[in-house]
Structures are given as structure tokens and as C-alpha cells.
Amino acid sequence: MADKIKVMIVDDSALVRQVVAQALASDPGIEVTDVASDPIFALQKMKVRWPDVLVIDIEMPRMDGITFLKKIMAEHPTPTVICSSLAEKGAQATFEALAAGAVSIITKPKIGLKSFLEDASNDIVQAVRSAARANLRALSASANPAINRPKLSADAMLSTGSHRALERTTDQLVAIGTSTGGTQALEAVLTRLPATAPGIVIVQHMPEKFTAMFAERLDGLCQIEVREARNGDRVLPGLALIAPGGRHMMLKRNGAQYVVDVADGPLINRHKPSVDVLFRSVAKFAGANALGIIMTGMGDDGARGMKEMHDAGAKTIAQDESSCVVFGMPKEAIKLGGVDQTMPLQQIPGAIVGYGKSC
């Protein structure tokens, strides 16, 4: 029998510690071995027993979560999940934590905390399982969860009417899908693109209200414009549109232009936004005029959509295992036969630029 994933929860709220521990206890493959009310107590306990995964808050007494995380990553790199407030200050600190090496985010509201965390128990379990599989070396350069949601396909969001994909034209676009480790991977890719890069549509699995700040942060770092997508936005050269957290994003055709349709809907592959929803819509409306890229992430969201893009004539790329934080989504896309080429993260910007020049 495989060893259990040993978890330490560090949060100054006794309620958060209790509810997160209860959620994790529902998975027989996870064991909460320690809890601590602040990083100082946590460091003392970690001298005796080091966890496989940390779940930590950002704002804590005596030492904040960012300082704690940086100390841990310098001394003994450990997969870490951030449990942060949805408040703007908390969200900004969360991106700093992701940059410092945290693997993923669990959001918590200021009001209705207990009921929210109970409802999000599956997300908590998934985040810890994903973190336990993380390749932390990729950040710096498979059991099923006990609680299952119905796993819907992208058919639930996409119309079933016939539509002939366009023959290859000069209107090219790039579609990117990613999850765990994706915030760092997207930054590494987008910051290396020139302002003349093809139009880009992106799904990054991320909680609601975080995507706008994430896009704003990237926009300040990139030559291209980066922003959270709005319904009806045109896909234009030099612009990257990121699907809003909690909403699906689909490509549509409006006359001679590509536009995005941002809409609510069910969880697809247990995600909203879903990479499959985006990729399958790109296959349907762009066909051979698209480049699809699937990057680091746990699970199989995007694998079917990439296969449909490939079959529609699009060029497809998967990030390779060595540079992925979690080699899940790319692996599943490769298994389905939907990937033309695999490459390390550092080569993806060049592939996008080369694709744009070939158009």
C-alpha cells in the first residue's frame, strides 16, 4: 500500500485548521500529521517531522506566509498550497507566493468561511494531491480523490450543430491551456513574446477574482497586452485574453473576425474555466488556423480538445515532462494522439514566434 501524503496545516484560524483537516481526512490517501497557528510553531514542529505537503495562510502573526514560504523553499523545498483570502491584498500576496514557489491556490472568503470550505472539500483534496506530485525543480527554472463530482465533457457547453472549420487563412491564433504550475509557466512564455505575436486565448485553472489581477500583473511584465477576457472581445495580434475564473471561454467567428464568448455553465472535467471547452471551440471555428499548446497541470482537461484541434488541422504542442510541475494534462493529450510535438518550457515562446512568422 502506498504511503499516505503527510500534510501540515498552518493557519491562525482554528476554524480553518479544523475544516481543512476534516476535508483532507475524507481521502484515505492523505494524513494530516500536524497543525500550527503560525509559522514559528510550524518550524518547531517541522524539526521533528517534515510534511510532504504544506497548506498555509498568507496573513499570520509573528511571521507572514510569504516569508515562511521563502524560508522553506531555501532550506527544504516542500510542495505548498496557499489558502488565501479573496480580498485584493490577499490576492496580490498570493501571486507573490506563487512566484516564491507555491504550487496552487485555495481561496477562502471573509464571510461564510465554514460552509465555503466544506463545499470546497473536493478542491482542497485535489490541490493537496496535485501538490504532492509537483516537480519543484520545474518551478524554479495517481490515485482518485475520495470525493467525486460528476465529470462532464465540453459537450455541455458547446453547440452540437454542424460547422465547417475554416481552411487555412492568414488569421492565425494560439490557444493555451494549463493548470498546476501554470501561472509561472505562462509568465515564462508570455514575457518572451514580441508585441507582434499572434492573438492568444488562454485557460488557466484559477479561482474567480484572481484572473483579473493575474492578467494585470502579466500585462505589466509583457510586451504584448494581457487582460482578462470579456464577452465579445476580438482576438487580435499582440493581445492575450485569459478566461475569467468561474466562467468558460469559447472561440466564435463573427464574420471575418475571431471573438470570445465568455459564459457561465457547469464544471467541465471538474473545472470552470475548462481547457477542453476552449480547445474544442478552437477546433470547431479555427481549424487549421490555430496553434494549440497544453502545459503543466494535473488531470486530463484539454486532452480531448487538443485531439480535436489536431484532427481539424491545427498544429499542437505539449510541454515536456522535465519542465512540467505536474505532467498530467500534457501526458493525457499525448496518450490520445493529439500532440504533434513536445518541447521544454523555454522553447515554447520561440515556437509561438516561429508560428506567427510562418503565417
UniProtKB/Swiss-Prot annotation:
Protein's GO biological process: chemotaxis
List of residues that carry 4-aspartylphosphate: 57
Pfam families cross-referenced by the UniProt entry: CheB_methylest (PF01339), Response_reg (PF00072)
Catalytic activity, as annotated: [protein]-L-glutamate 5-O-methyl ester + H2O = L-glutamyl-[protein] + methanol + H(+); L-glutaminyl-[protein] + H2O = L-glutamyl-[protein] + NH4(+)
Molecular function GO terms recorded: phosphorelay response regulator activity; protein-glutamate methylesterase activity; protein-glutamine glutaminase activity
InterPro entries, per database record: CheB-like, CheB_C, CheY-like_superfamily, Sig_transdc_resp-reg_Me-estase, Sig_transdc_resp-reg_receiver
Gene3D superfamilies according to UniProt: 3.40.50.2300, Methylesterase CheB, C-terminal domain (3.40.50.180)
Enzyme Commission number, as recorded: 3.1.1.61, 3.5.1.44
SUPFAM superfamilies from the UniProt entry: CheY-like (SSF52172), Methylesterase CheB, C-terminal domain (SSF52738)
Active site location: 179, 205, 301
UniProt domain Response regulatory: residue ranges: 6-123
Posttranslational modification: Phosphorylated by CheA. Phosphorylation of the N-terminal regulatory domain activates the methylesterase activity.
Enzyme kind, highest EC tier: hydrolase
UniProt KW keywords: Chemotaxis, Cytoplasm, Hydrolase, Phosphoprotein
One annotated Gene Ontology cellular component of this protein: cytoplasm
Compartments, as annotated in UniProt: Cytoplasm
Location of the CheB-type methylesterase domain: 167-359
Signal peptide from the UniProt entry: none
Family annotation (HAMAP family): CheB_chemtxs
Function: Involved in chemotaxis. Part of a chemotaxis signal transduction system that modulates chemotaxis in response to various stimuli. Catalyzes the demethylation of specific methylglutamate residues introduced into the chemoreceptors (methyl-accepting chemotaxis proteins or MCP) by CheR. Also mediates the irreversible deamidation of specific glutamine residues to glutamic acid.
Domain statement: Contains a C-terminal catalytic domain, and an N-terminal region which modulates catalytic activity.
Family: Belongs to the CheB family.
Identification of the protein by name: Protein-glutamate methylesterase/protein-glutamine glutaminase 2
Native source species: Dechloromonas aromatica (strain RCB)
Gene: cheB2
